[in-house]
Amino acid sequence: MIRQERSTSYQELSEELVQVVENSELADEQDKETVRVQGPGILPGLDSESASSSIRFSKACLKNVFSVLLIFIYLLLMAVAVFLVYRTITDFREKLKHPVMSVSYKEVDRYDAPGIALYPGQAQLLSCKHHYEVIPPLTSPGQPGDMNCTTQRINYTDPFSNQTVKSALIVQGPREVKKRELVFLQFRLNKSSEDFSAIDYLLFSSFQEFLQSPNRVGFMQACESAYSSWKFSGGFRTWVKMSLVKTKEEDGREAVEFRQETSVVNYIDQRPAAKKSAQLFFVVFEWKDPFIQKVQDIVTANPWNTIALLCGAFLALFKAAEFAKLSIKWMIKIRKRYLKRRGQATSHIS
């Protein structure tokens, strides 16, 4: 019985030893397979790990370099956007300070009859007549003729000198510009103590406004203060071609100005010698063309365009700042990840 028990115990021990050997062989084979996968030895494995870490390092460096370049580019774009904002605001302020003059023309069929204020002094009005296109030849120069003009006489104090009283003859001017209506006036000056003889005149915008004015004296003083005066000489026929200019002031009021072109023709005096002592004056008033010139200052600065440019510039600034912020965070994250992997590789090698 004792031998039988010993034989069974030996058999169990031998079976356990066989299992241990088999397990050790399997472990050795697994180690060999792992060694085969990793490489022929320990040193080649370390070389591959160092090579992969160097590749990762080079990629990280390239990414960091490109990130820095992008940050500089966006900083440059931010500087350009700031400069554009500054220039936009500066240009807008300059355009507000210096408006551009705009000139337009309005065609009319007829004008309001202008007022012609004449200051003949000692000269006598011989004739005043409306004609169309052509002035007929003079029949009796130096003698009183037809008076078919609407005239008014007024005396008022000179607005520039309170001691001088001026006497003005107000004549209704032409209206029908398309029919080439004109007004022909003839004056005679018998005697004059002056070396040169001339008659002053000024033009104002509306003869009807003068008639309807409750204070005609003040009206004429205001006209003389606002409008320029001209002269026409004796012994000539002075042809005045008028044009009207309306200027819009900054406060919204509209100022009226007359511009004129004059042509002077010598009068061939064929009167007897006894009558030539009296000086004759001839003047013609006519509209130059049917166009009223309108002048106004226009501010070319458009606030909506400026606002749109500013919004675009500020949007570019915010986007650039946001991208720079994200790029910096990404660089910090990549740096931390690289340091972490490097520490893990060092601990694994050790």
UniProtKB/Swiss-Prot annotation:
Chief location bin: membrane
Protein name: Proton-activated chloride channel
Effect of K336N: In a breast cancer sample; somatic mutation
GO terms for biological process, alphabetical: chloride transport
Domain of life from the UniProt record: Eukaryota
UniProt xrefs under Pfam families: TMEM206
Phosphoserine modified-residue sites: S9, S14, S24
Job of this protein: Chloride channel gated by pH that facilitates the entry of chloride ions into cells upon exposure to extracellular acidic pH. Involved in acidosis-induced cell death by mediating chloride influx and subsequent cell swelling.
Topology class, membrane: Multi-pass membrane protein
Residues in compartment: Cytoplasmic: 1-64, 319-350
Keywords in alphabetical order: Cell membrane, Chloride, Chloride channel, Glycoprotein, Ion channel, Ion transport, Membrane, Phosphoprotein, Transmembrane, Transmembrane helix, Transport
Catalytic activity line of the entry: chloride(in) = chloride(out)
Family assignment from sequence similarity: Belongs to the proton-activated chloride channel family.
Gene Ontology MF annotations: pH-gated chloride channel activity
Modification sites for Phosphotyrosine: Y10
Protein location: Cell membrane
Gene Ontology CC annotation, any one: cell surface
Cystines in this chain: none
InterPro entries: TMEM206
Transmembrane segments: 65-85, 302-318
Tissues expressed in: Widely expressed, with highest expression in brain.
Keyword Magnesium found: no
Posttranslational modification: N-glycosylated.
Glycosylation site list: N155, N162
Residues in compartment: Extracellular: 86-301
